Amino acid sequence: MTHDKNCPCGSQKSYQDCCQALHLGLDSGAQLATSPEQLMRSRYCAFVLKNFDYIIKTHHAAYLDGLTLEQLQQGPHPEWLGLDVLSANDTTQPDGSKFGTVTFKAWYKMNGEIDAIYERSEFIFEQGRWFYTKGHQMHAKLPGRNDPCVCHSGKKFKQCCMKG
């Protein structure tokens, strides 16, 4: 990814000014996500860039359910179209533990069909950083023909991703 392209997470910043620092700084602890939303956006970006090591390392080990780096590398690998964050929050419990949720739609195309992962993701803050734990899937409705395109091009859906 070149510096002149916007980060896939939808922030409207360049990748270098956005998720790259999180992707490169995770192992050293130099740069960690400061909120569930930032972690979720950086994980979406990692899926787009096929940085599956980041996906595994930001997924809480107790919730992997057998998911491996090899499985992620094998695919399937859709063409990611865009991310819509619908809501995000985090709370601190009286005992000091932190939890968060992010509801989003991650639009993709696979085998010529457009669909979305529509999920309410759950996160936990442990060992000084946020981890993804699990997600609750919901059904995503495709936009109408005259609605804005899911890829955030500024075009109508019928003039953009719906065409091809």
UniProtKB/Swiss-Prot annotation:
InterPro entries: NTF2-like_dom_sf, SEC_C_motif, UPF0225, YchJ-like_M. It comes from the Bacteria. Belongs to the UPF0225 family. This is UPF0225 protein Shewmr4_2054. It comes from Shewanella sp. (strain MR-4). Gene3D superfamilies: 3.10.450.50. Pfam families: SEC-C, YchJ_M-like.
